[in-house]
Amino acid sequence: NIAAFLALSGIWFLSDSALAQEYTSFPALTGMISFYAFMLMSVPMVHFVKNTLKFEKYKVLDVINLLFYANALIQGILNKCLKIHMVHMLFVTHVLLFIAVITIVVLMIEEYRRTKDSELKIIMNAFGIMAVAGVLSLCMYWKLEIPFYGTIFEVGVLIFEQLLLTSIFVNLVEQAKTRSELEVYERLLKEDRM
């Protein structure tokens, strides 16, 4: 899930730049790839939350993923059949992203209050940072029409990814520590039997 998110966000970062779209042999295709990567990069993020944090009980996450898939499919159909430009439908994707991140953050806050899990806190902070970067970039895009709005969101995504990777690293270290402790206890138990 992390690898898919990293791949899709990386594709979006590269294909969303004006430089990539202007100097490629296929600018329309590059733009289309950018839109689809942006529309779908949240799907692996939601799967990560469900699988890593054991949030399978929250069916709203399945609904969110279905909405992301439906959004990409419907926008593709509208673009192909009715020639509606993707940029004119971008607001729908922004609203879905906003709803998804807020929903996930609220679920995490509730779960953290219940469990006080340190890994959850790191991931919750990552989503919080991405939510702030997302809202800030949306305001810059829709209200202020500031051209570097994408950079703000990209920085937010990079911080988000860094915190997720930190969470994975912390989890691996804790698992290694637990495994080492178990091996020591097993050795002690073996020595006691002798």
Regions found by a protein language model. Name each.
Residues T178-M194:
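Amphipathic HAMP/coiled-coil signal-transducing linker helices
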Residues N1-L6, I11:
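Juxtamembrane interface at the cytosolic side of transmembrane helices
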